[in-house]
Amino acid sequence: MAENKFKTAVLATPDLVYNEGKGALSNQYKRKVEVADCQGSVDIDFCLKDKTVGKNQCRWDYAIGSNNQSYFVEIHSADTKNIDEVTKKADWLKRWLKISAQNLDEIKHLPFYWVATSGIDVRNRNKMAKLATLNVKLVSSPLVIKA
């Protein structure tokens, strides 16, 4: 049986709960992400909401395993007014990976994905450029992760 590096990394990370397949994604969001060879998922936001590392923070939503990599996915409305919030979440994610989730950091896939819950209406190029420097890519749904 092939090693599941995603599951190993999740289990080595404090406070996270591993889920089979897309089990960590809420039902309304499962159709927003298509994953070939899904190796599991984590609801980062839920797992860390009451923990010191995540309490009162803008937290990233999900980690999804595929191809022995961790894909980080934020499912959020995509209007110009949401850019600052997603930027804060991406900043938090990068810090958390370096400080508390090094095993996931080692297998992270870039870019981080911001998946629009519906249409995309973003009109501020400067703020989008800031997201690009954080390796965040805004995509319409569904996000397709290929094997």
Predicted regions mapped to residue ranges:
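Domain-level recognition of nuclease-like catalytic cores that cleave nucleotide substrates
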Residues: 3-8, 106-147
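The feature represents the first ordered module of a protein
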Residues: 40-42, 54, 72-75, 82
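Acidic-basic catalytic patches of nuclease active cores, encompassing PD-(D/E)XK
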Residues: 1-54
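Mg2+/Mn2+-dependent nuclease catalytic core
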Residues: 79-96
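Arginine/glycine-rich "motif VI" loop of SF2 helicases in the C-terminal RecA-like domain
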Residues: 95-107
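Conserved catalytic cores of phosphodiester-cleaving nucleases, focusing on short active-site segments
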Residues: 62-64, 68-79
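Short, flexible loop/turn motifs enriched in small residues
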Residues: 55-59
